[in-house]
Amino acid sequence: MKIVINAASAKMGGAVTYITNVLRCLPGPESEYEFEVFLPPETASEQVGLARNVHLLVTNIGHASWWKRLWWEQITLRSHLRKTAAALLYSTGNFGMFRCPVREVLLVCNALYFSKVYREGFVPRHNWRMRVAFRLRRWLVRRSAESCDVVMTPTQALLDDLRPAVKVDLHKALVNPYGVAEEGFSPQPVEGATPAPGEGCGPVVRLVYVSLYAEHKNLATLLEAIRLLNRDGGRKFLLKTTVNPAWKDAAWTTTYRDDLALAGQPGVAPWVEFVGPFDRAEALRLYRGADIFVFPSLVESFGHPLAEAMAAGLPIAAADTPVNREVCGSAAEYFEPFSPEDLASKVTRLASDRALRQRLGLAGSRRAAAAPGWDAHVRRVLEAAKLGAAS
């Protein structure tokens, strides 16, 4: 059974994390499957140790203009499916093929298109070209979801946001949580003077926030909270984050200038270090060097960093959103998303209460260990390929 996986737009961030883990878990040549995977060159070069029946097809179409990508996905890829006698198309990047000639499973994984917070709070601040492009992409996702055989989301929260905008029958909708990459992320044992993550908060508390910069990542709320946390002469809070408004790909956002200015203010700059973007090994060191993980992001489809922080045994302070609660459950303290005061209060509580930190860290470790792994995620994709969305 030949399965074509379209991940041609998986260039960075969660898209790369996703496809990398999926490819590593695809069944080998002893199975009935053969896989052809479209990937951009920079992502393809990072894939090692794949099964012999996984064939990478490198393409630069993910870097092309939207209309060229649309032509490729609707015309060029359609021709490839017919010529290669593929049995299934797995579209991993929100956009699918209209009237696909074979069975299609579509992963909707960009929550921005269906987030009321993003549509009302950020889209109107963009120029007319960006607003038109957003509406067009949202329409394409809706049309793709209506056209495919199975619609898959990583969280129930995203499916709940999708349903008011798209007519998705119950029999074709599937919530398939992402796995948790546990290798190397398990909590470190206490040895000598080396504390496990979340323990030993003393005069300096180490905070970490891992993600790529975007306007919905809500960096301003965190920076304002850092100012509040460090305004007296007591305990100091140091933030290390990869959410960098000076990142080369941040210029499209409407918030990066304000965030850069805020980060440079005297009450903020001494306590914030921008780092990365990081590869997996560097990110692991970042988690291990932290006391508390903070996650103010307003919109997520799943939140890979939350899963990684739980696997690392870190106590978490997260924005109170449906998806964050779905992923973390009782393993986090939640704050009002736009309230620096509430965020600062929750972080102060965590820093002052060792028992609470340990309880949240243990709850996160157990939750990550009990969560379905990437093998289970891939298995459900393959089941959907043959049986539909019945779970």
Model-found features: residue ranges?
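Short alpha-helical donor nucleotide-sugar binding micro-motif in glycosyltransferases
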Residues: 81, 285-290
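Conserved donor-binding/catalytic core segment of Leloir-type glycosyltransferases
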Residues: 4, 199-217, 223-226, 240
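Nucleotide-activated donor-binding/catalytic signature segment of Leloir-type glycosyltransferases, i.e.
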Residues: 52-55, 243-245, 253-281
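Short hydrophobic beta-strand element within catalytic cores of glycosyltransferases
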Residues: 306, 311, 315-318
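Carbohydrate-associated surface elements
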Residues: 157, 179
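Aromatic "clamp/platform" in nucleotide-sugar-dependent glycosyltransferases that forms part
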Residues: 298
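Conserved acidic donor-binding segment of nucleotide-sugar-dependent glycosyltransferases
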Residues: 333-340, 349-354
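Membrane-proximal helix-turn-helix segments that form the acceptor-binding/catalytic region
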Residues: 130-151
